[in-house]
Each structure stands twice: as C-alpha cells, then as structure tokens.
Amino acid sequence: MTTTSANVGETLSRSETSTPTAGVPQPARLASGGLIDRARSLPFSFDGRKLFGHPGDTLASALVANGVKLVGRSFKYHRPRGILSAGPEEPSALVELRSGARREPNTRATSIELFDGLEAASQNRWPSLAFDLMAAGSVFSPFLAAGFYYKTFMWPASFWEKVYEPLIRRAAGLGRAPEGIDPDHYEKAHAFCDVLVIGSGAAGLMAALSAARSGARVILCEEDFRLGGRLLCERGLIGGEAAPEFVQRIEAELRSFPDVRVMTRTTLFGTYDHGTYGALERVNDHIALPPPFEPRQRAWRIVAKRCVLTAGAIERPLVFGNNDRPGVMLAGAVRSYLNRFAARPGRRAVVFANNDDAASVAVDLHAAGVEVAALVDPRPETKPSSVALAEKTGARLIAGGVVTGAIGGHAVRAVEVREANGRSSRVACDLVAMSGGFSPNLHLATHLGGRPVWDETIAGFVPGDTPRGMAAAGAARGTYDLADCLAAGAKAGAEAADAVGFQTRPSAVPQVEPQSAAVTPLWRVRGHKGKAFIDFQNDVTDKDIELAEREGFRSVEHLKRYTTLGMATDQGKTANVNGLAVMAEITERSIPQTGVTTFRPPFTPVAIGALAGHARGKEHRPTRFTPSHEWAHAQGAVFVETGLWLRAQYFPQEGDRSWFDACNREVIAVRSRVGVCDVSTLGKIDIQGADAPEFLERVYCNSWKSLPVGKVRYGVMLREDGFVFDDGTTARLGPDHYLMTTTTANAAAVMQHLDFCHQVLWPDLDVGLVSVTEQWAQYAIAGPKSRELLEAIVDREHDISNAALPYMACSEVTVLGGLRARLFRISFSGELAYELGVPCRHGDAVIRALMQAGQSLGVAPYGLEALNVMRVEKGHAAGGELNGQTTAQDLGFSRLMAMGKDFIGRAMSQRSALLDPDRQVLVGVKPLDPSARLSAGAHFVPLDVPVNPENDDGHTTSVAFSPSLNVSIGLGLLKRGRERMGERLRAVDALRGTDIRVEVCPNCFLDPEGARLRG
C-alpha cells in the first residue's frame, strides 16, 4: 500500500530544516518538496488570526504548516482536539467555514481546499478555543457516560424542559447554523457512462485507463482536487518515475480520450437502484465566492452500466489513553502532510503501530528532519526489518510494548509506554503517529443492502455481495500491496469494459517494490490512563462500550444508538470496526458473530441546496397560472396559492374596506345576477375505451353504466381502506368517452391512483387515461342570469334552454363564431349555473368575451373566497370535510353507494368501526347569537359539561359568513349528528379563546329543494 524507498527525486525531496517560503513565515513548512505552489502565498484566517499557505494546500495542511495544533473542542466533553487524519474521514478538525449567510458549520478542515481570503473558525467553545469554560464539564464526565440522558436529570421532572435540556443543548453540539437565506446557487445534472470508476488511487487510475483504452465511455470521480489518492504521499518510484509524475502521466492520457470525463472535487455519496449513483461536485467551493451565474455545487445523477469501486481504505486509530490529544495523528496522515504538503506535524515523534505499513512513516519522518524518538510495536516478535528501521532512523525500538497514554493538554508532550516486561517509561514527543490497520472503504458497496464480510488476513471487513454491475478493486477490496493494487485495478477496468461490449486487455502494470501491510490486531490497550476514544466525533470511549454491554445493549444496532457510536457526521469511518471489535472482545465473540452496522447514503454530508438545485424559494415547485391569470391580474385580483396553482382569491373594488366586503359583494352578485369564476384548476381526466364504463364502476362507489351520453353524474371515490379519497363529476361525452373532474388538491393523486388501477390491478381492461387539466380552460358561470349571459356568446345553432340542456346535462357547442367548447349544466354554488370548457389557448379571450357580454347583466368576477362561501351555504363537502378520516356514510353519501357491485374500498367500508352509529357525521351549525362569528376547528361540547377531551363530540370543519342569510354558518363533524338536529351545543375554540353557543341544523342552508339550480 505504501513504499519505503528513499529515492525521492526533486518533486518530493525533503530538507531537514524549515524556512519561510515566498517571504511569508510558516514555521512548520519544509524548505522544499511537496505538491504546492511555493511561488504564491494565500492569506487566510483561523479564529481571526491571519495565516498563510500555498495553492495546493488544504486548510488542515496550512494549519499544520503554521504550527497550529489545537483546532477544536470535542462534542460532549469539550476536550482539546487537533487534526487526526488528512482525508474525508476526519472526525475532530471540524470548523466553521465562511461567515454570515454563507457560514458552513462542521466542515472538515482536511477536505477544504485553501483559497485566498478563506475564513475559518473553531466551534463548540466559549469564550475562546484555548480557554474553553465548557471544558470544566469534564469534572462531571462520570455522569455523562453512554445513555446518560436516559438515567440522569430525571428529578424533579419539571426541571427537564426548563433547566436540564437547555443546559445540555447549550453544552453539546458543534457548529452554528447559518443566518439568513443561502445566497449561493446550485445545480442538478445527469450523466451516463459505460464504466464509472470511484476513486483515483493506484487501482482507480489503472481501472479508468484500461476501460478508456477500450473505447468505452468512462467517468472517473475523485473527491480530492487532485487525482492520485495515496500515491500523492508516496516517495518511491512506480515504473522508474516518481509517484506524482506517474499520476500526472496517466491523468494526461485519460483527459486525451474524448469519451472520458475526469471529475475532481466530486464525491460519490450514494449507490441507488439500477446502476444509479449520486455525486456532489464542489464546483466553486475552492474560491471565496462563486462567479456570477455559476453554481457553488452541482448534484449529479450518474447512470452507469458498470462501476469499479476503488475508494481505497481508511486507516484506523489505536485505542489508548488520551488518544485524542492534539498531536496524536494517523500515520498515513503524517505521511500526507510531510510528502504531499511539505508540512511538518511535529519535531519529535513516536510511531505506535501494529502493522508493517507504518514503517514508511518512520522513514519519511527521518527524511524530513523529524526526530523519531521511539518505534512502539505491540507485536511480540521482533522482525529484522524493524531492527534495521530503528537503526536507520535512530529510534528506540520497543517491541511488544504499547502506548498506554498521551500526556499533554492543548498538545501532546510525551507518552507513557508499557514495555513487554511490564516496565513503564515516559517518552517525550510532540507527535504520535499511530496506525491500527486499515478498513476498506466499502460504504458505497453496501448502500443497497449488501453485507460486508470479515477478512481475518487484513483484520477488516471487505465487500460481500456488491450491487449489480459493481466490482471492488485495490485497497477497497482489502488488497494493500501497491503492485497488487495496480494489477487489480487494470483487471477490473478491463472486465467492466468487456462486460458492456468493448474488447480490451488490462493495461500493463508498472514495476514497483514489494511491500507488506501485515497486521496483528490490537483493538485497545488494556490498563490505559485517561479516556480512550473510539468515536472521536461523538466522544465515545471504550468504557462506554463496556457500559452498553453491561446494560444489555449488545446488538450492534442497539450499541450504535445507545452510545451514538458511528452516528456523527463522519458515520464512524474511523470508529466502527474498533467499536465492534471491543464489543466482540467483551462478549467473547468473534467480530463476524458480533455483526456489522448498516451504512446508508450519503457517504459524506451533502448540502441540502445541492439536492434542491434550482428548486428553492418560489422555484421549489413550478407555479401554475390559470388561463385567466393575466386578465385577473389586470382587474386587480388578489391571488392565493392553492396547491401549485395561483388563483384569484377576490376582486377588490372601490368602496371595499377589506377582503370581507369584496367577498360579500361577489356572493350577492352571483345570487342576484351572474358571476364568472375560473375553475380550470379542477383536475380533468379524459377516459376512453370500450371498458371505460366498467373501469368507472370499479373506481367509484356509485353506478356509471346507466349514465346516458350527454349527462353528468356526481361520483365519490374511496381509498382501499374505505375512507373517502376524492369526489367530483364525470360527464359521458360518448359511448366510450368520459371526462372526469377531481378536486384541485387531489388532481395528481387521483391520476396516479387511476394509472395504478389500470396498469397493475386491471391491465386487461380496454381503457386509456390522460390528464387534460392544462389543455382545457373551464369557467363557472353562475347566477339567475347565467343562461342569458351564455346565450350571448354561444352560437345560435345550439339550444341551451332548460328543456334542451337540463340540470346535470352536457353538450358540445361552439362559441364566439365557431370556437369549439363543452358546456356542462352543473352547479357548485347552488344557483342556475354552467361550466364552460374551451381549449386553454383561448381561455383568455373567452373570459374577456364573457365579461364584455355580461356588462348589461351586471356580471361580476368572483374568486375563491366567494366560491367557498357559496359551497358552505349549499353544504357541499370540500377539503375540510374530505380530510382522509371520513367515510361516504359520514358525509351523507350512503345512498350513492351501489353495494350490489364491487368497487375499491367496498369491503373495508363495511367494517364495524366505520358503521358505528356513534361516528361523527356531517352537519350544519349556526350561532344562537347572529352577531357571533364561528371559527373552523372549534370543538363541539354539550351544554353544562366540562370542556375536556371526554366531552368532545366533534368540531367545525368549514365556516363562512353568509351574506345571503346575514349570519355566520358552518359545517362540522358531530357524533350522532343526524339524530341531534335542533340541539344546542357549545363551539369551543381554545386556541382563539372563543366559546359560542350553536344550534345543529341540516348542512344545506340555502334552497334545500334545489329549485334555483334547476331553474
């Protein structure tokens, strides 16, 4: 996996002294080497302190180069924390990036590309990072063990919300959420390829190269801003050239292929069905502000025929006392800062590792001029290579020993070492490079439910059943030797291309020196001093695991939730295996027997804005305008959002003091003259086919085969559970042709439901369905003069008299000299009324013609408020009554239900609970005091009984002031309501503080005989 060659070349050469570069002092910057641009300096700030770095740095490497070790405080105990890793697995160095509305909390310093003017701040501290008063809480740490919130702060109970919870919330947490609306823009994009390669380390580069040479369409995703992965940290040779030069050559060849897309700064965060992957591209996160009209980030939906997972492996920390102190780092991270960034993490180091791979860090430290004080190897046998390494670096070799604890506060000063003979000693140091082995980065291989498999040879989990079309290679598969990684990647890329029809052979693998990553597991150091952390981000220690086991939380998923192991923003990348191993050790089970936790997307945190793309604010969903919108806007209409639609709520005129006056005026106009309302938002579904009548019989609870052509019928649709789903009218336009209308709110849901019924339940029926909601403009023309108005625009050859077009009839007509239209004699207002449908492109012209023709009749436009008042006056059920909890019987539709046939919801509608006579049913209510105003949601309580849940008999669902009756009226659901006509109740609205006496009455307040609508 790494190389120990001392041949470095100019690109990664090292000096033993640190000197300022580009005239800017950076006390821990090596004098030469690294993949940074020393010709330029980038100013940045950390906690208000101005510092400098170079292009090619991350924030973490720049902090290391400036000698900054303390970068944060821990989640629960507020312990000093430094930088642990050099990649996306970082659990400790979490900072706030930027400020104001662009502030981004909990950002990993190791993944932030340094840019000019970068602002970063530590978090979870007060008043300062160096002096955090909240750290005093460590005194109470015995009371803050795993699950403490279930066992402490329980008395007195009244203190929880007012005292305990606020204190806990103030003490815990990490960053602060941004203030204000996010000013940045985001995009969503789609990509398609033959082969997707995830990760650009040794295996990833070879996989992409093999696939690209075959002619396949290849996408190579790398979350870093450079390709190469751990090759960027290597000091050895690959095929005779320095590792970074090898990476540059392969990258240049990949970019030369027209069908290869190399995507740096792009994280694959999720694996989904059918070869679909989610990726986040950080388009402009590496600069202070995105350029105008460019996104900050872009969310990709990538569809790949084959995928090669070459995401590498994550180094595990060792579990010993105070292993979280600043200056205690992963060995691989130390190599990264030395070799890639030319930043020295310390001056005197102790290397503590249980595997051969960590020998490389000792060589690199020595080459960089860092004194290697000790090599602590817990393995009992002493290898000749270890002796040679100690001699080369001048380090003391402590074979069979362990580090029991780190000593220091804001930075490590020394370590306590227990040797094989039991003797303890102290070794002074300011850097501990630790390595507990490696865990293959297999998260993406398990997102679809695949379970990883334990591999004893590497002491880690490897991918088991990978998603269809995915293959893992290299370190992600548990292969750590560099030569084997190169070969495995080349083979996997060639096989992926071959599987999709491209003939190729694996690319030739360059020669490299053989390596060893042999590991002897050490899951924790026994007898350690101080807290030994397993999950650094959530402050979970080995003692927490022991406590969870004692309290019965031995299951992996229980352990995870009780201790919060692996539940932080890093998802336990460095913690999970160690936590499982400690539980296995305590319970005397193997790790496979203990189990493995479930990995879920996203792999790393993803900004919500990126997932939304342009769909934010008013663009969250498209706004739909009615055909008469421009005309209504010109009339000064006030609009209201109803679902996705923007509808006219009312039309204010001179003299109207408020919406209330405008609404009353519009209602009176309809009741006395004629009004026009745009009802195009109602769902309209065109149904055709020989089996259309049978289809309607099954989806509606009432009968449809008997409906004649040219007639309209009201219908009620039930859900499978027997409750009312939707209602509306359906017109029979021809023997096999129907037009169904739905409520505005349920238009999409009903269409989806009908499609399901057709395609899944009854695919044998000869019927076709299509939504025509946006193809037809529909206007309600209501009032005693509505026929006169229509006669002015309907062409004379069409007879629309009461005899020719009675109530609930429909007809094809032409208007305005030949314009095709549909006329329906239906009424929602209770007046003589029609609905006129015309092709949508003519909707604006028709509304203008109607208003022009109706001037002599006193025509008035009316909006949603007046429409609602008139439907309450007539007792029609709508949204408040169709709440998903009412049955057809509750709403008075029992006679509609054709129980002699089968229909959706029939069986469940006959359940005893739904036929209970005590159910709440639809009634009308009016106040005893005509001046009182009812409110929706008021609860019905019998007179002279306490107001409590036991005496709650129902509630009002819709209320309105009726200008026709000059009184407030309402609809409601009342227990045994039909038996209680004339009874007096209290309508109690505790929220608004009202208590009104009402009388129960029929739900139809106006013209119950229907004489007006049949006139």
Description of each model-found segment:
Residues 2-49, 53-623, 775:
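Residues forming the flavin
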Residues 46, 97, 642, 720, ...:
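Structural motif
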Residues 221, 313, 553, 664-680, ...:
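Residues forming anionic-ligand binding surfaces in small-molecule and nucleic-acid pockets
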Residues 578, 585-718, 723:
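Acidic, proline/glycine-enriched N-terminal capping motif
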Residues 629-634, 647, 734-736, 742-1015:
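Conserved, structured C-terminal
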Residues 705-736, 740-756:
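Well-ordered mid-protein domain cores that form the structural environment of catalytic cofactors
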